[in-house]
Structures are given as structure tokens and as C-alpha cells.
Amino acid sequence: MSEQIVTPESSTPVVLNNETKINLLDLNRQQMREFFKNLGEKPFRADQVMKWMYHYCCDNFDEMTDINKVLRGKLKEVAEIRAPEVVEEQRSSDGTIKWAIAVGDQRVETVYIPEDDRATLCVSSQVGCALECKFCSTAQQGFNRNLRVSEIIGQVWRAAKIVGAAKVTGQRPITNVVMMGMGEPLLNLTNVVPAMEIMLDDFGFGLSKRRVTLSTSGVVPALDKLGDMIDVALAISLHAPNDTIRDEIVPINKKYNIETFLGAVRRYLEKSNANQGRVTIEYVMLDHVNDGTEHAHQLAELLKETPCKINLIPWNPFPGAPYGRSSNSRIDRFSKVLMSYGFTTIVRKTRGDDIDAACGQLAGDVIDRTKRTLRKRMQGEVIDIKAI
């Protein structure tokens, strides 16, 4: 007899039969409980299975020893736990690891960044990106599609499984996740939010909401919607002290200018506990483009009403880019100006640049299926959030 379940991507029920299996990595806990209810099982069974999936990175129902054999057999008929596979691994001299992960016939990239007191995983949300930020390698690849929930949380699952199996090498377990990989997360809310819910869920990866960070270039209506959906730490890709410069290097600014963007940020902070009252400002340092002391004074004036800390990011080069990295002396002068205004200012340490895993260098393998007119539409207006 066929069963029906609602998938995260659609409100249309999918008929389960011998040819169709639900990937349980696509379901958050609420959806998992509904799925088990449709199987005639009690909701706590969903919690048990989620614990196996995420606490132990188990993808084999037969290994779930506290699940009865009848249910295990039923699950094998209608469901699967299928994370995307790693097809290439590169290791940096500084300990950073970059994985190329297959999503269908393409690849996205995921980066593991170990530090003394933490290990951060940088996760992708889309195959490519449509926003065309001029200093970012991903943006030069074009845009293909949004990642599914299973392809987003599957990056965390796969990395946790690899790191967990390598504990003897001293690799630190994942403590933080940043949605700063390939893509604009707010153009994929339908899948990004359930994936982050699994990251936060005690039966998922159980991360603190202060340890899950979403970074956005400024899709303002989607940012307003995010605040009603989930509470996570927020970082914003600002990169300029005025609209003239930002219009050039971050084209979405032509639709949602800095004032509009920062207004949405402040509205988000009013709803959020994860941010402890302030947002992280990301500012890539481009030589003689946005890195002068006059730009630092402008930035300080711009941000005086926005509680924040500022991350200055030395630009990481990629082939064909028209920019240069700011010198250490220019970055130092810029930082000192900001600190003189009382801003907490950090110069981000470049990690993984020898394997093209540093900020702005992720490229993956993207078949660009977004015509330029559609890219301009994505930059200039918000796509129906229900459709992304």
C-alpha cells in the first residue's frame, strides 16, 4: 500500500512506492515525526532515528539496534539516509581541509577549518551564485540551482563522519557552522532554514544558535522573513563604506542599498538572541578600492547606529580577478581608524589559501543555467520565497 509524505520542497504529497524513497536527511524533526506518523509509528521513533543519524553519523537502518526489526524493515522499504559523497579532498599546510562534494552531476565545496579552541565548517547553500559580487570566485561560475536540505545538512553529516573517524589524528570535532560557502543562503530559505534547524536540534547536531552563522549580501525581504523563521547568528557581506563603491562590487546593492540593508539588519537584531545584540560586518580589503583611511572613517560613521563587530578580510585572489590584496600596512591603518571609534575590529586570518579554500575562493564545478536576464532579476528583486 502506498504512503504519502510532504517533502520540504513542496506541499504536494509524494507517493511512496518501490521506486521512490524519502531521503531522511531532507526532513527536520517536525517533518520526521509526521513521516513516522504516516508509517503508523509513534513520534519518539523519529527522535530515535534522528539520534542515530546525527549523533553517530549512521546511514544504515540495520545498525540502529534500539529500533525493532519490523520498523527497520519498513524503513528500508520507503526511506534512505543518503548524504552527498566527497569526490576530492585537499589538505592545506595550516590544517584546513577542502572537500569537493558531488551534488548530482556537479560539485560544491565545503571547508573544515580547525583552530585551537574550535573547528568551523563552511557550508555551501547553492550550486554557484547569481549575485555576481566582483571579488568572489564563486560568483564568476554562474548559477545552477539551490541545494536541497539533504545536500546542505549532508555536508555537515559527511564532514562529521570523516572527522569523527579520524579522531586518532587529533582532528577537532565540528563546533561551529557558517553558511558562507557557495551561494546566497537567503535565496534558498526553503532549504537553508530546515537544514539549520537540524544543526540546532538536540536530536540533530545540537549546536548552539550562537555557533551557527548565516552570511548574506543583502536580500532584504528574505532577511526580514528569516527573523520570523529561525534565530541564528548573522554576518553581513558589506565590503564598502558607501553606495558608490558597493554598487560596483556587490551589484545587489543597486536594488537594496546600504541604508535599506542595515535597516533590515537592525530589525533582525531586535528579534534575535543568538547575536547578543550585534552583527558581524564582513569587509573584504581590496587594494586602493575600499581600503583607504577615508573609507575607514566613512565606514565608522555608517555603522554608528548598528551594534556590530567588524571582520576585515584580506582579499584572496583567483585567476582573472581585477583586484589586488591590500597591503598589511593599509589594513593596519584601516583597522586602527575603526578601533579609534570604539569598534571591535578583527583582521581575519587567511586559512587554506594554498588549496583555494579561503574566503571568496570556492568555485566547485558549476554548469551555469542562469541566463543573464534571470541573474539580473535575482539581483534586482526577490524571487518568490515560497519558490526558492
Curated annotation (Swiss-Prot):
Cofactor(s), by name: [4Fe-4S] cluster
CDD domains reported for this sequence: Radical_SAM (cd01335)
Keywords attached to this entry: 4Fe-4S, Cytoplasm, Disulfide bond, Iron, Iron-sulfur, Metal-binding, Methyltransferase, rRNA processing, S-adenosyl-L-methionine, Transferase, tRNA processing
Gene3D superfamilies, per the entry: 1.10.150.530, Aldolase class I
UniProt xrefs under PROSITE patterns: RADICAL_SAM
A GO BP entry: tRNA methylation
Subcellular localization, as worded in the UniProt entry: Cytoplasm
Cross-referenced SUPFAM superfamilies: Radical SAM enzymes
Cofactor note: Binds 1 [4Fe-4S] cluster. The cluster is coordinated with 3 cysteines and an exchangeable S-adenosyl-L-methionine.
Active site: E109, C359
InterPro entries cross-referenced by the UniProt entry: Aldolase_TIM, Methyltransferase_A, RlmN_N, RNA_MTrfase_RlmN, rRNA_lsu_MTrfase_RlmN/Cfr, rSAM
Binding residue positions for S-adenosyl-L-methionine: G183, E184, S215, S237, L238, H239, N316
GO molecular-function term, one example from the UniProt record: metal ion binding
Catalytic activity: adenosine(2503) in 23S rRNA + 2 reduced [2Fe-2S]-[ferredoxin] + 2 S-adenosyl-L-methionine = 2-methyladenosine(2503) in 23S rRNA + 5'-deoxyadenosine + L-methionine + 2 oxidized [2Fe-2S]-[ferredoxin] + S-adenosyl-L-homocysteine; adenosine(37) in tRNA + 2 reduced [2Fe-2S]-[ferredoxin] + 2 S-adenosyl-L-methionine = 2-methyladenosine(37) in tRNA + 5'-deoxyadenosine + L-methionine + 2 oxidized [2Fe-2S]-[ferredoxin] + S-adenosyl-L-homocysteine
Pfam families xrefs: Radical_SAM, RlmN_N
Disulfide pattern: C122-C359
UniProt-listed Enzyme Commission number(s): 2.1.1.192
Major location category of this protein: cytoplasm
Family: Belongs to the radical SAM superfamily. RlmN family.
Note, other: Reaction proceeds by a ping-pong mechanism involving intermediate methylation of a conserved cysteine residue.
Protein name: Dual-specificity RNA methyltransferase RlmN
Native source organism of the sequence: Salmonella paratyphi B (strain ATCC BAA-1250 / SPB7)
